[in-house]
């Protein structure tokens, strides 16, 4: 209870931070008594404060959900003592990533939440989770090595890792050099964001984890990669040399991801593919390189964080209520669990882009920005975005048809369920539905936390005007380099970096 209350208070504090950053400008903190660019600078501008606020909503809802579910069922096999502190460590890493004003501390933030994610992914130590965890660790280590290599290239080229000052000095380098370094960052962040062709690891690892773990991973971890790409694109590599490449990546990410989704029988795996697909929309906005495109990307990220997390929490409810997340084993949920059906249908339609939900509004913002760009590649992306939205809706309605509307007796394996609900420790043994323990027993807190997140995601529809206004201002301030650089460097862009003795004098 104390942890949930603390997480709830964080939501309020970060709402205040958005107001402060929006009305009073960028907020900076110089850590350890050293000013930028030598010291560690924490930066809260409109973009980072928006991401912090949305992440706090997700972290609060998932913690509430986790504490409410089988964590209090008295099961000694559930590693509760490991989950909660590791979850807090992951939260710290995500927050540090959003606030970092230099590339090295961005790297540190990534490493902190990745270490926590290794533990969370393999909780319960089932063979399937350990196998998926090994692959996840290997991919994450490769991403971290590429990130560190890119960071070293920046320092070797411009003598600083402070993003504001690095952006100034990058302008003096040849275009080819800047493009090569930025391409290295795209690979590093692309692995974390799961963009094509660096996405194959995600659908193989996320579905194996517990639902609460998958929910927070899907909602936040990939978006940290997207945020990092926005940040370095808008502050360090401002020339737009690789925008056309990013457009192609965005198109392929959308199409390949959604094609994978419509072929799935497991709901978790299907959701994992839709997660990959919709990262493509955010890359679309970044690649346009305009204020309208970036605003659309930020708006869509806010929408997607809340909607995708709520969908994974609903899958957890389905698993506990019906004993499976396999479509070939599901049916009749609309009649046996109407509340779960409603909690699924609203975010599913939202993700599919049905008007007037925020998913539709975010896509319209991106399509309008693409039309303003006017290039043939932008028009191809617009077509890809529309097709992806339609196929996403098809995939979501396929789950609705088979899992909620169909009679369970008509399902190919409708009588096969998990022997008991899986909380954190994986339990993969199956029994006939009549022999299952705890049939349909879902704690109220799991419903309430999921409903809270569904309500939060739906509220974007009604608050679309104010939210799009602040994302517009966030995009404008991100594109106006003088504002960010002045706030971080304290109007001293020529401050020394390598010669610390001269700096001390």
Q: Which sequence ranges carry the predicted segments?
A:
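Single conserved hydrophobic/aromatic residue that forms the stacking wall/gate
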Residues: 2-8, 12
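C-terminal TM-helix exit segments that contain a strictly Trp-centered aromatic cap at the helix terminus
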Residues: 13-22, 148-155, 351-355, 460, ...
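Interfacial/capping segments of alpha-helical transmembrane domains
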Residues: 16-33, 466-482
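Peri-membrane helix termini and adjoining interfacial loops of integral membrane proteins
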Residues: 22-34, 157-166, 321-322, 364, ...
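Hydrophobic alpha-helical transmembrane segments in multi-pass integral membrane proteins
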Residues: 25-94
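Hydrophobic transmembrane alpha-helices and their helix-loop junctions in integral membrane proteins
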Residues: 61-74, 87, 91-104, 117-364, ...
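Short phosphate-coordinating micro-motif centered on Lys-Gly-acidic
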Residues: 111
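Cytoplasmic/organellar membrane-interface segments at the starts of transmembrane helices
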Residues: 327, 334-339, 396-505
